[in-house]
Amino acid sequence: MSSRRQEALDYHAQGRPGKIQVTPTKPFKDQRDLSLAYTPGVAEPCLEIAKNPDDAYRYTAKGNLVAVVSNGTAVLGLGNIGALAGKPVMEGKGILFKAFADIDVFDLEVGSENPEDVIRFCQLLEPTVGGINLEDIRSPDCFYIEQKLRATMGIPVFHDDQHGTAIISGAALLNALVVVKKEIGRVKIVFAGAGAAAIATAEHYVRLGVVRENIVMCDHKGVIYKGRAGLDEFKQRFAVDTKARTLAEALQGADVFVGLSVAGIVTGDMLQGMAKKPVIFALANPTPEIMPDEAKKARPDAIVATGRSDFPNQVNNVLGFPFIFRGALDVRAKKINEEMEMAATRALAELAKQEVPESVSRAYGGDKLKFGPDYLIPKPFDPRVLLWVAPAVAWAAVASGIAGRIIDVEEYRAELEARLGPERQVMRGLITRAQQDPPSIVFPEGDDPRILRASRILADEGIARPILLGDLDAIRRQADEASLTLEDIELVNPRTASDRDQYAQELWQRRQRRGMTQREAQARVLDPMYYGLMMLRAGRTDALVAGEEIDYPDAVRPALEVIGAEPGRKHVSGIYMMIFRQQTFFFADTTVNIEPDAQTLAEIATATARFVTRLGVEPRIAMLSFSNFGSVKHPAAAKVQQAVALLHEREPELQVDGEMQADTAVVERILTKVYPFAKLRGPANVLIFPDLDAANIAYKLLARLGGAEAIGPILVGMDRPVHVLQRLSEVPDIVNMAVIAAVDALEHRRHAGSTK
């Protein structure tokens, strides 16, 4: 069994099986809550809804609930595998809805291939959900099902396989034609593929301004031309008068190619006959009709888009459906109509022309993203997409008369910002950023099974280039037992490495006046931890992650000996990212400084602020205490006051204040009403604790009891990227830490001006 296959199976099976769950949104801790949540109290909202059905949006979750409905007849590239086998895909769709637009999902698999059964099933769901996303239903059934449901139901129904690609590629088409300076009403477009996505995309292009007669569509039998036998009603719409009978012939003189078919059906030679500055959308997944490098080699003047994240201009449906439904639900739209789809396309096209924030550019490798041939549409993890597409869709629903609720666009945009703050995108953005230029990361505990699995993930996902230290036979044996390949993973045994003597000499020179003898240095570099640190110091690797098999202090101590704190700092400190459903906090110092004085607290705050800023998040720092702005006279509170004074003096532009209690820091109402003089422009997202006791206890309680995902400890203040795991970390924790280390390494490289 391949490691990727096993990893996917483990991902779905570990812990609670599957990928989604139902979480209560109201307190439910005693008899009183029970009487309100259920009988007798629940009768009151029932009676209100009976009098006014619209009150269902006030008293139930209907307004934020979408059903993902499938019968499993066309599941991804797997075909007709059935409703039950397609369930993991539908759960995955639910994750995307939640992650990108905070929409709750019931995935509902219908055990019938009869379109009438699917239609009736969906119609009966109307009292339950606010919208229906049809998924993975074969053509032409999908057309009939969607048309019938849109005509008979009073909630949005949307078949993403049809319209998603149309909406996103439509934005790319508009902008590509701007770049090549061609008029949409004059271009000739050739489609490879005539399934649901191709038909819907072609129709959407016509609404954008493409002349229907200028579209040539090809299926597996060749060109769809007038008079060809066996065409269904949907293909008939695109039958044209032409002598072309093959895809190659159709491409002669074409301005645009849109591939929604299968891998490798287009060659470089076939592109030679296209018009000047051709636009090539090779959208088959995972392998396009022609690879971008091959297309550019054949036609250097071409603009190329694919469905892949490792090339420019990724046409990804996740840019559409979460935000389209968000806008539709928020105005209680009765349907998703053509005006709303068009609004989504034009919003995406316009957003791509705006200046891209540095935080988004950093997430995609640091190169400045700018509208042009390699940046036609926004990136999937650009948090601005929500703020552009959802309001555009919502307003289109209002303007076209199908909305049940009128909105103020600016107020609505503010609601969206509050619903999904940019911090929620942090980890996704970091992964994407690391993938742009994967650094090398050395793992001293190379034969640990969890380190091996994490390294396999990092290599497969293109996040980092792992280097595993240890006995090579032991590493290979562990990999074999775990059915893991070691492809693209470097193995090094410190005991036989050719540079061990050089590292021993360098270590001795660094520590000889700290009591280390030359013989001790020679012995130390045989230890994978010391050897890995020397690799990092010598520039042989970009970052180090360790601590899986040793206690935290025993991992930090060698790092301080070999690497040390960065110039100008006396202390290093540990941060935990605490990710909640709606926001992310940064806690410090959670791991290193037991009883920091005021000077050290100030240093911890500035180091944490710099780290948070590098993530693209504006730090709002609260210096915590049991006292609020001098309310208690005590040396412990005075220490925090002194740290705040130092920060105000040294970093006047930094949003930092205190001393303050924890609830004051995170509850905006308390902060603004009771302490309006505070420098924070909103609730704090960085919490600096007065000592290690408080910080360590707080993060562990919130991780175990408060539902937070804790990512860390992230070591800041080191001269080079060293990150230390908690002992016996699980594979996802190791991967998260490696992602942090990778981005840290890229930042160090950028600031050092290195071009390694």
At which residue positions do the language-model features occur?
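Anion-binding alpha/beta catalytic cores of soluble intermediary-metabolism enzymes, centered on
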Residues: 84, 136-183, 404-405, 415-756
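Adenosine-phosphate binding glycine-rich loop
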Residues: 160-161, 180-182, 282-390, 397-400, ...
